């Protein structure tokens, strides 16, 4: 069979199982109210948790950065592409999130996926055992596979099982890997216990704070700051295209760890540095996140989270016990989930249907993503739509 025929058959199978993914095209900036595929909608799909993606100060910072540093970096960070904007952002990030370790540094990446691959492949290898939460993000899973380390998967947030696995391991190097906020469930990892286990067993703890950075902790400094953790064994990874409203990612750790990544992390070394203007805008975003406006946006977001939790409990479906901006509602079957999402879409509400392989079979769900840009009136619309669908399903 020709390769194209093989792919076509595979696509037919994806369609038959109700698993084909389709891109939608936004005609306006990321915001609570958008025009998508030519239609006005209220969006509950983005990870713009603080509503900063269209913030006037960040738009101005992008323009200023482009005027100062140009449209592109022109090279990799080690071959001419490392600009003053990148260097300044790394200093800003180290100061903002690096309080968990002495002599902290930060390293800026183009994407969170690259940051996770870079960290795991540079720090782990043969002779290393990675202990990975069962619901970790795909980029952590792929990084673990590419590292060539032995990988042991522990049940989701089950620290008793993890403890037993660590006790039984005779690996030269042990690394615990976990999301902080899990992207499809919205729950938070037991970070204090994970760090306790890491220190007991002389292990690294690498956490991906993609959905916690900017939202959790004092001044939005993230899940590690919220848990008040400090340790040289700790490495924090965060993204800058979610709550920060721009793009990119970072790794924060002791300066020796960061220098090792500069020397050995292939996804950092062998790629063109990101647009300097984006780095310039992220520095502006950090000032908003850590200031009074950031506090006000987080407070409003918490109000929306509380209301949404109560709203979802009143439906005939299964809400996940999430206290974060990720509010899942488990429907179960793929077809039913797609139909509910389509009905909400016809009512002008964009609520994504999440299906396998992103989530386990039988747990297809609506993933309601809240933003400080949403108003109570936006939630009124969502609540009305869910109530109508719930009445039909009851």
UniProtKB/Swiss-Prot annotation:
Physiological role: Catalyzes the decarboxylative condensation of pimeloyl-[acyl-carrier protein] and L-alanine to produce 8-amino-7-oxononanoate (AON), [acyl-carrier protein], and carbon dioxide.
Cofactor or coenzyme needed: pyridoxal 5'-phosphate
NCBIfam families documented for this protein: bioF (TIGR00858)
Family: Belongs to the class-II pyridoxal-phosphate-dependent aminotransferase family. BioF subfamily.
Superkingdom of origin organism: Bacteria
GO BP terms in the entry: biotin biosynthetic process
GO molecular function: 8-amino-7-oxononanoate synthase activity; pyridoxal phosphate binding
Binding, pyridoxal 5'-phosphate: 112-113, 183, 211, 239
Pfam families in UniProt: Aminotran_1_2
Pathway: Cofactor biosynthesis; biotin biosynthesis
Keyword vocabulary terms for this entry: Biotin biosynthesis, Pyridoxal phosphate, Transferase
Species, as recorded: Paraburkholderia xenovorans (strain LB400)
Residues that coordinate or bind substrate: 21, 137, 358
Protein name stated in the entry: 8-amino-7-oxononanoate synthase
Catalysed reactions, as listed in the record: 6-carboxyhexanoyl-[ACP] + L-alanine + H(+) = (8S)-8-amino-7-oxononanoate + holo-[ACP] + CO2
Modified residues (N6-(pyridoxal phosphate)lysine): 242
Complex formation: Homodimer.
Annotated signal sequence range: none
EC numbers: 2.3.1.47
């Amino acid at each position: 069979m020709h390769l194209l025929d093989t792919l076509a058959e595979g696509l037919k199978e994806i369609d038959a199982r109700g698993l084909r993914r389709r891109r939608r095209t936004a005609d306006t900036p990321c915001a609570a109210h958008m025009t998508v595929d030519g239609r006005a909608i209220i969006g509950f799909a983005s990870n713009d948790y603080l509503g900063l993606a269209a913030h006037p100060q960040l738009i101005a910072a992008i323009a200023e950065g482009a005027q100062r540093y140009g449209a592109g970096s022109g090279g990799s960070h080690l071959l001419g592409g490392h600009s003053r904007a990148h260097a300044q952002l790394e200093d800003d990030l180290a100061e903002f999130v690096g309080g968990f370790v002495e002599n902290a540094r930060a390293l800026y990446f183009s994407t969170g996926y690259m940051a996770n691959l870079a960290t795991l492949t540079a720090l782990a290898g043969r002779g290393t055992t990675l202990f990975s939460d069962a619901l970790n993000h795909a980029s952590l899973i792929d990084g673990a596979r590419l590292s060539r380390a032995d990988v042991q998967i522990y049940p989701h947030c089950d620290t008793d099982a993890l403890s037993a696995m660590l006790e039984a391991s005779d690996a030269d190097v042990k690394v615990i890997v976990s999301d902080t906020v899990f992207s499809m469930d919205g729950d938070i990892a037991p970070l204090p216990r994970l760090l306790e286990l890491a220190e007991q067993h002389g292990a690294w703890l690498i956490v991906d704070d993609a959905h916690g950075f900017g939202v959790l902790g004092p001044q939005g400094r993230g899940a590690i700051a919220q848990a008040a953790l400090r340790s040289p064994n700790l490495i924090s990874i965060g993204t800058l295209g979610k709550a920060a409203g721009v793009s990119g990612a970072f790794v924060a750790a002791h300066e020796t760890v960061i220098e090792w990544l500069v020397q050995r992390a292939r996804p950092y070394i062998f790629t063109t540095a990101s647009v300097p203007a984006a780095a310039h805008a992220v520095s502006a975003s950090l000032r908003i996140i850590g200031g009074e406006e950031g506090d006000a946006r987080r407070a409003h977001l918490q109000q929306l989270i509380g209301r949404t939790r109560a709203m979802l409990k009143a439906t005939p479906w299964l809400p996940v016990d999430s206290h974060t901006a990720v509010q899942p509602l488990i429907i179960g079957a793929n077809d039913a989930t797609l139909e509910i999402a389509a009905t909400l879409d016809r009512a002008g509400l964009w609520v994504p249907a999440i299906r396998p392989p992103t989530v386990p079979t039988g747990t297809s769900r609506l993933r309601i993503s809240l933003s400080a840009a949403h108003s109570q009136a936006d939630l009124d619309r969502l609540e009305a739509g869910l109530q109508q669908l719930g009445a039909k399903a009851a």
